[in-house]
Structures are given as structure tokens and as C-alpha cells.
Amino acid sequence: MFSIRYSLIFCIVDLLLSLGLEILKIPSGEITNLPYLRKIGKIGCKVIISTGMADLGEIEDALDVLTQSGTKLEDITVLHCNTEYPTPFEDVNLNAMLTIKKAFPGIKVGYSDHTLGIEVPVAATAMGAEVIEKHFTLDKSMKGPDHRASLEPDELKAMVKAIRNIEKSMGTGIKKPSPSELKNKPIARKSIVAARDIKKGEIFTEDNITVKRPGTGISPMQWDEIINTISSKNYQEDELL
């Protein structure tokens, strides 16, 4: 039985290569299949490997086989995965994806999802997943273990749209005003204004000045610099200094 399955899975790999595929996906169930991993590794193409049911030690062993057989570490993407259909949310353990990333510098990480809905793969994207795998079906009511945890066409479209929006939202990490919000700066911020009518030569105090919108005048951050200085002109109540 082993020899039959062994030959079949090797034939499938050869078939996929004959079709011109440039990336091969190793399913969770094959992560401990040494001959299979060695064959994939010798090809030297890009590899995605799922890690359902595996611990860090088994992942390390699989990566060692692949790299020692010829696959470059930077060409490997490791998908965190839970092989339960559907996966309970409390068993997802998305933080394990970050553990994998930290444990194996140089690899890419992603997430293979078997939960219901699209929330978890979207969250994985926000956490740094570079690849998302989600099962697809035309009808969730069909028989078989995968269909219930799969997405129908409209759901898949919604997931992809949400992921693309998250990718746009990640940004550069530099904290500065965005072009879209700059126009709101003078509206939302405040300036120092006269709390009542102020005469020329009068001393500015906490009783005759206050802070109000818009933010087109002197910033309230200069409050201490204004207090106890002398007014150079007359001000009406609410007038910007």
C-alpha cells in the first residue's frame, strides 16, 4: 500500500511540474513524509508548506530536508494551520504564525484557514501573513469534510476585498499626517483667542484669553509664551490672537 501511494504522489508532483507550475504546495499531512519532502526539495522551486498538526520541531525537520535537498530558504513560505474542519476559533492560535516567523529567520509566513467566515484570514493579513489559503466551494451543503469550512463565490470575493483593504491600511509605519486628513487640521485643532474684548496695552492673562476652534491662529502649545505679555492691539471677543 505504501509503495502504491508513494508512487502516486511522486507522479502527481511530476504532473504538476509538466503543467508549468512554479510553486508547489506541501499539505499538512505530508510534513513528515521524508521521501516526498526530499523530492520537492531537489526540484528547487518555490514551496509553500502547511503545518497543521505539527510542532516547531517537525517544522524544523521539514525545512531542513527541503533546504538540504536544494530549496533556498527564502523560497519557502510556511503556513500556520489547524487541521480541523471547521476549526474552533479558540484553537486557531494566530500568534503561532509569529512564533514560526521568529523561529525561522529568512522564511515567509502565511496562514491556511479552516474556520467559518473570513475574520481570521483577514486578521492574519494584518499580523503579517504573506499568503492566505482558504478552501473554495460552489455549495457549502455538499457532502465532504471541506465544504462547510469553505467559502462560496460571493464570500471569497468579500474575503479578497477585505484582505486588499487591510493591505492598503498597513501603511509605512511612519507616524505623520496623511494627505487626506491635512484638510481637517485647521478645523479640528484650536487656537488662542480673546475670551472677552481686550484693549491695546492690556496684559494677557488666563482670564482674558482662551482656546477655541479653528486652528488657524497661534497654537495653544504657545500658551505659556503668551501669558503675561502685552497686547499690541485691540481684540474683540473670540478674535484670534
Task: Enumerate the predicted regions with their spans.
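Catalytic cores and adjacent flexible loops of soluble metabolic enzymes
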Residues: 1-241
